[in-house]
Amino acid sequence: MKTVTVRDLVVGEGAPKIIVSLMGKTITDVKSEALAYREADFDILEWRVDHFANVTTAESVLEAAGAIREIITDKPLLFTFRSAKEGGEQALTTEQYIALNRAAVDSGLVDMIDLELFTGDDEVKATVGYAHQHNVAVIMSNHDFHKTPAAEEIVQRLRKMQELGADIPKIAVMPQTKADVLTLLTATVEMQERYADRPIITMSMSKTGVISRLAGEVFGSAATFGAVKKASAPGQISVADLRTVLTILHQA
């Protein structure tokens, strides 16, 4: 299986990489959060642009991206607008969403973008190609905050992301039962062992699913999300605790 290298970080080998999310509403918030994150132990900084109030003004978005880049100089920057329908803070039209991601790619300030699988195949494929032309990696994602689909459906979605050119397919689902967590882990193993030719990221959310955030190296998930301050999704644990557990499992 091939790995994905972003800056000096190799995703898909060794312990799962830790991603943290920055969620400031204004440029001032974004700067202060980035400064607070500077000393934290993580691997990838995700900027959750859907939390940013001025998201429809390209100049403001790029100014904020530049501010983050000036403060966090050494870590890969992942640009993510999470749509309202997949748990995000705001809604954009498909045209606005694609234009925003293309502007991020054009800026040269971001290393990765997050594209939601269900944006539309043609739009997704074209935007993946555009990102790759500019040496920007693509995490393709799907989120279900209500349930855990069947393992076959989870695998099918991850395979579809791979077919559409994602560098890293990602899925996050909500467990209603403990068995749902096993469903997600089973799907992860099946995808990783039978179909994946690149790293994948999977997680079962909430307190019930927290084991999935810790045991990625065992089951086949190449990265996990931790919290520096406020969690960006239910079930996230602090980056310090996360690193400790990931290291223990890696060295076992």
Swiss-Prot record:
Record field: catalytic activity: 3-dehydroquinate = 3-dehydroshikimate + H2O
Pathway the protein contributes to: Metabolic intermediate biosynthesis; chorismate biosynthesis; chorismate from D-erythrose 4-phosphate and phosphoenolpyruvate: step 3/7
InterPro entries: 3-dehydroquinate_DH_AS, Aldolase_TIM, DHquinase_I, Type-I_3-dehydroquinase
Keywords: Amino-acid biosynthesis, Aromatic amino acid biosynthesis, Lyase, Schiff base
UniProt binding sites for 3-dehydroquinate: 21, 46-48, 82, 213, 232, 236
GO terms for biological process, alphabetical: 3,4-dihydroxybenzoate biosynthetic process; amino acid biosynthetic process; aromatic amino acid family biosynthetic process; chorismate biosynthetic process
Oligomeric and partner information: Homodimer.
Function: Involved in the third step of the chorismate pathway, which leads to the biosynthesis of aromatic amino acids. Catalyzes the cis-dehydration of 3-dehydroquinate (DHQ) and introduces the first double bond of the aromatic ring to yield 3-dehydroshikimate.
Protein name: 3-dehydroquinate dehydratase
Species lineage: Bacteria, Pseudomonadati, Pseudomonadota, Gammaproteobacteria, Enterobacterales
Gene name as annotated: aroD
